[in-house]
Regions:
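C-terminal helical subdomain
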Residues: 184, 208-243, 247, 254-256
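Canonical Rossmann dinucleotide-binding motif of NAD(H)/NADP(H)-dependent dehydrogenases/reductases
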Residues: 3-36
């Protein structure tokens, strides 16, 4: 994305050893920034530790983002290296279960809320002092178009994503006086393994074939297509740039104009 480059910023990205998180990290590395990454997938972490920029402009650790003690330990490690950060991207998220509410397991609900919502709280809680030390900065929360519509058979996921938008709006008001901007990105259906798993689960739940489900997902957006992780990464780069310095409390959709979710 052709935005003004502001090099040498310290940026924390959760769930960033693979997929969208790693895509955002690579875009930001190209901008000249230093990224502090974390993930629960040790195999992917080990792969990134072979990168030529490791311990120079890439730092990565194992973190269970849904566990407050794990997140606290991670931030203690970061604080031993640097005293401030410029930005936090809360990227952790899972698809959660698919099915009627009465059939869902309590543990499935709790895992979805812990991962998709509580992780944002934990990371943000410990990031705020580092952002204040920086005299300002930016927080990006990854929500979803499921946080803008009702989403039958995906209630835990939708509830968690609506909550992320509430978190974003409230924090933007709370942190504005410290020159900390807070925005949410709402991706639509993003091409990749996660949407493939969702399609498979929904097809099984409804007793129809996966091709039908995929076509219906595509039809939910005016542009009749899925988005790519690079589209989301471009939006993140923009929101962290100087060009977005007056944008806060906003919900930015990157979804091909979702018209419905069902």
């Amino acid at each position: 994305m052709d935005v003004e480059k502001s090099t040498d910023r310290n940026i924390i990205i959760s769930a960033s050893a693979d997929g969208l998180g790693w895509c955002m990290a690579t875009f930001l590395l190209d901008q000249g920034h230093t990224v502090y990454l974390s993930d629960i997938n040790q195999q992917k972490i080990n792969e990134i530790r072979k990168h030529p920029l490791i311990n120079k402009r890439i730092f990565i650790d194992y973190v269970d983002a849904g566990d407050s003690a794990s997140v606290k330990k991670y931030f203690e490690s970061i604080s031993s290296k640097i005293s401030s950060i410029d930005a936090l991207i809360n990227n952790v998220g899972i698809a959660g279960p698919t099915g009627p509410m009465e059939d869902l397991l309590i543990d499935e609900w709790q895992q979805t809320i812990d991962t998709n919502l509580n992780s944002h709280f934990y990371f943000t809680k410990y990031a705020i002092p580092l952002l204040k030390n920086n005299k300002g900065g930016s927080i990006i929360n990854l929500s979803s178009t499921a946080g803008l519509f009702g989403f039958p058979l995906r209630t835990p996921y939708a509830a968690s994503k609506w909550a992320v938008i509430g978190l974003t709006k409230s924090l933007a008001m709370e942190l504005g006086e410290f020159d900390i901007r807070v925005n949410a990105i709402c991706p639509g259906s993003v091409s990749g393994d996660r949407i493939d798993r969702v399609i498979k689960a929904k097809a099984k739940s409804l007793g129809i074939n996966e091709k039908e489900v995929k076509e219906d997902f595509e039809a939910m957006a005016s542009l009749k297509m899925f988005v790519d992780k690079e589209d989301i990464a471009n939006m993140a780069v923009f929101l962290l740039s100087n060009e977005a310095q007056r944008i806060s409390g906003q919900v930015m959709t990157v979804d091909g104009n979702t018209e419905r979710m069902n």
